[in-house]
C-alpha cells in the first residue's frame, strides 16, 4: 500500500517537478503522460499485491495531478485578471488528466501490454487537447 501512497504523492508533486523539464523539452503531452504511466504502474503493482481494486486511488491521482498543475498556473490567471478561468481550467484539465490516467489503468490492469496502448492513446488525447485549448 506504501507504493500506492507514493503514487498519490508523485501525482501531487509531478507538475512542479516537471515545470523545468517542460521548459527544455516542449512536449508536455508526452512528459506528463509518461509520469502518469509510472503512477499507474505503481497502482497496478499495489493492486496485484493487495488483491483489492484501486480504481478510486487511480482516479484520485489524476485529480491530484489536475489540482496541483492548476495551482501552478494561478500566477498566469492572476496576471490576466480573469479569476473565472481557474474553475474552467480545473474542469477542462480535470477531465483530461483523470481520463487519461483511467485509460492507462483500465487497459493495463489485466496485461501490461495494455499499458503501452493506453499510454499511446493518452499521449494522443493530450496532444489534441492541447491543440484544442490553444485554439480557444
Predicted features and spans:
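Hydrophobic alpha-helical segments at protein termini of multi-pass membrane proteins
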Residues: 1-136
Amino acid at each position: 500500500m506504501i507504493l500506492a501512497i507514493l503514487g498519490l504523492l508523485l501525482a501531487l508533486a509531478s507538475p512542479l517537478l516537471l515545470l523545468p523539464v517542460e521548459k527544455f523539452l516542449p512536449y508536455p503531452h508526452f512528459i506528463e503522460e509518461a509520469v502518469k504511466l509510472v503512477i499507474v504502474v505503481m497502482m497496478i503493482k499495489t493492486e496485484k499485491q493487495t488483491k483489492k481494486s484501486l480504481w478510486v486511488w487511480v482516479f484520485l491521482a489524476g485529480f491530484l495531478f489536475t489540482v496541483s498543475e492548476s495551482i501552478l498556473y494561478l500566477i498566469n490567471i492572476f496576471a490576466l485578471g480573469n479569476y473565472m478561468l481557474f474553475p474552467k481550467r480545473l474542469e477542462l484539465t480535470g477531465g483530461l488528466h483523470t481520463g487519461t490516467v483511467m485509460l492507462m489503468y483500465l487497459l493495463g490492469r489485466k496485461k501490461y501490454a495494455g499499458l503501452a496502448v493506453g499510454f499511446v492513446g493518452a499521449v494522443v488525447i493530450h496532444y489534441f487537447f492541447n491543440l484544442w485549448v490553444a485554439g480557444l
